[in-house]
Amino acid sequence: MKQRIIHIIIMLMAACTMTAQTTVSGTVTDGKESLAGVNVFIIGTIDGCLTDSLGRFSFETTQTGELTLRATCLGFEDYTLTTHQHSNLHLKMHERATAIDEVVVAASSYHFGKSDNFKTMDALDVVMAGNSCGDIVAALQSLPGTQKVGENGKLYVRGGESDECQTFVNGMHVLMPYSTNTENNAVRGRFSPFLFKGINFSLGGYGGEYGQALSSVLPMETTDVAPSDKLGVSASLVDWNIGGTKAFAKSSLSFNSALTSMGLYDAISPDRYDWTRPYRKLSGEAQYKSELSAASIVKTYVGYDLTSVGQNIADRQLSLCEHNIYANATLKTNIGRGYTLFTGIANSSVINDIDDALIHGDHYHNFRNEIHLKAEVRKVFSPSVKMSAGAEDYLRHSTKQYDANGYDLDYNLLAAHVDAQLRVVPRLFLSLSARAEQASYDGQWLLMPRMTWSYVPNKRFQLSAIVGRYSQVAEDDYIALRGKRLQQSTADHAILSMQYATAKMLLRIEPYFKKYHHLPLLTDGTYTADGYGSSKGFDVYGECRSLAKNLNATISYSFNDSERLYRDYTSPTTPDYTSRHNLRLTLKYGIGKVIFGLADSYASGRRFATGTTPYYNSLDANLTWLVSPKIIVYSSLNNILGRTNVFRYNADGSAVTANRDRFFYIGIFVSLKSNKAYDISNF
């Protein structure tokens, strides 16, 4: 028995010895250097191994004849080789090219929150910093490229007027994104930051989808369908809010109402002005969002603001009342074969009535309305090609009456665009777009080509170059006075952007140049399109999170040199709203549930016919206390040192300053549901 077992073992060993053992060996490189950790194996078997630190591999197999090898490695394209050779193999792998949808070109744009292609900073971090006091516009003014114009608080970008920056909600235009106020008092943005999952601020060089903005665009994307019910309140010395959401299976309905009143604050801390009626704003908003399918979503929004204020000015009692209504509805759906369709409609209406506007006993009335229609088709054809094309129409109506003088103006703007984003080679990307626009009152078509080259060698570094042409119609007053024969203004942008980013720091440097053509110019008592101008400079933005634990520091600096011949200027002059130097330093430090913030803002003096203003400086502090997941207390003190900043000079040489040197704000956010306080989101 034992002998039989021994014979069987000997026969099995002989059979194994007779089976051919083949050694497969070689090296793996990327064409320049050896690659370690590459998985090399024979397809259809378990035979294989990982390459060593020198890129070498060697394993045995029972396979004979022709072999099909595959090599896989993170960040590289899979490599397949069919060969009869078993040794001294040389496998050359290629780095996996980034798909066009995976690239986020940061050139001349800043992104907050989450949008279709961006995921960076939460909107709460942006708003609860510095002196923003919950205002998107004030928060964005901390970025490089923006100018400090304290007497109205609007966005001025890279030497451009405030109306050269246009706002879009879900891709649809907003005619008037600001609240109103009396002269020399700062306004606020009329939208809550908590409405949006993405705030994407472009300082210039934007694509063909957007138009009618000579300098910049501010596209904001509202949140999607809410997954749960929400209810929350917030209160401060100047405003009171309540907002909530009812969530359904595949849809949600939201509301928000707010009352802003300076009456209590003015009673506690009077300012320099004589108010006959304190500033008050009553606003309400509602949203309905529905997921029709996995690839289709409908979003609707409607908002209404009523603003009222009265002020004693010299020998008159100015009384202002404004109604501002904005509504939009959009549909985004997959229409098959990889195509995505976007359609939208928006309506903006603004009604202004002012008594004692300029002199005692006069009356000013202005009604503006805009209907915006838009359709766009998008498709990703391959990892290297992405395209979109669309058309839109702006239908505008404006009436103005000042005592016996006035006008009634109607016109529309047609536009079409085509955009293509291409991956030229693995690290080089090209964005091409063309936009054509026509104003009905002159019938002239404008063709505006735009191009962006982006070199993205790795996740840390980006280098981009942007050129493009942009257009915008003049203000309604100028079009009406010219008898609807005023050519559109245009601006040519050239931008170079360099960005280096790691987990601990960010550095961005952007030189730019803008050339303006056909600006409105007062000539012989009427307006022509013979004005021109230029704006050049550079922006620097740095952020560091490694100075100390829980400490975040930022610095933004802008240099701008602008010159224009427009409006009633008699020679090319630096516009009075621009300052040559703008600098802002911020620090944010967290200890447990408390976050401290400190910001110092500086702007050089602005030039006026009656002189140059002193430099602007404001040291601001804020504190956020996360009392619990449902309660947040936020406070801020602006201009701690109490410096009296001069914003500009009147024609008689008198200085225009803020209505108060310091402003203190304290507010509380409370969630009445199970979600976190900052999720009440005014929705």
Language model segments and positions:
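Face-selective signature of the C-terminal outer-membrane beta-barrel domain
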Residues: 254-255, 285-307, 318-443, 450-456, ...
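Periplasmic-side early beta-strands and strand-to-turn transitions of outer-membrane beta-barrels
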Residues: 213, 225-228, 242, 247-320
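Gram-negative outer-membrane beta-barrel transporters
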Residues: 424, 513-515, 529-606
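Conserved C-terminal beta-signal and adjacent last beta-strands/turns
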Residues: 245, 465, 552, 575-683
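Short, acidic, small-residue-rich periplasmic hinge/interaction motif at the N-terminus
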Residues: 29-31, 39-43, 72-76, 84-129, ...
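Membrane-embedded beta-barrel scaffold of Gram-negative outer-membrane proteins
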Residues: 342-352, 456, 462-464, 488-545, ...
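Periplasmic N-terminal accessory/gating domains of Gram-negative outer-membrane beta-barrel systems
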Residues: 111-165, 171-206, 223
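Short, acidic Ser/Thr/Gly-rich low-complexity loop/linker segments typical of extracellular
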Residues: 46-56
